[in-house]
Amino acid sequence: MWKAVKAQMSEQEQYQESPENNDDEGFDFTHVNSVARIALYDNLLSAPRVTEIQPAPTGEFIESLATNVYQQSQAAGGTIPYTVIREVSENFIHARFQEATVSILDHGCTIRFADQGPGIACKDRAQLPGFTSAIEPMKSYIRGVGSGLPIVKEYLDFTHGTISIEDNLGTGSVVTISANGSNPQLPKELEIDHV
């Protein structure tokens, strides 16, 4: 059966999905040893301001990254909630935090999360509840039940924002989330009348 599946997959997908290329079991998930970078763009005509998130225990690293991205995007005028940013930030664990880079664009309304990990082979299924590649050592830091990106997608769908998942250059993934302008709107049926 594995041969039939392999025949239908591209070379990159074969590399990403092949059990012999999955070295997560030997990876130390307790501490992030790499630096993450946050690039805040005022516009695309000038270089971004770059903030580095230094190596730290995994829980602290994820919290620091998500908090810094949230604060910088809000200060730039964005409205993407912390929970949405946190869910995507946690996904870097699947890439073993390899070259984690977050770009804040469009006055904080677009945030792009890029890595050079193994990538996401099934981009559509990654946005559906219950599909997960989390293994036991990751579950000390994330729920690991396949709910992260579906939560993000649901929020962005309700507020007329967008999420896209693409292959990065060479290897890895790029997840881009965008709010609807600077003031996303809830559907009328979810609004509360203020009297």
Q: What do these predicted regions represent?
A:
Residues 1-46, 84-85, 89-195:
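Conserved beta-strand-loop-beta-strand hairpin that lines the nucleotide-binding pocket
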Residues 50:
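Donor/substrate-binding cores of folate-linked one-carbon enzymes
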Residues 53-89:
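Conserved short strand/loop->alpha-helix "switch" segment adjacent to the catalytic nucleotide/phosphoryl-transfer site
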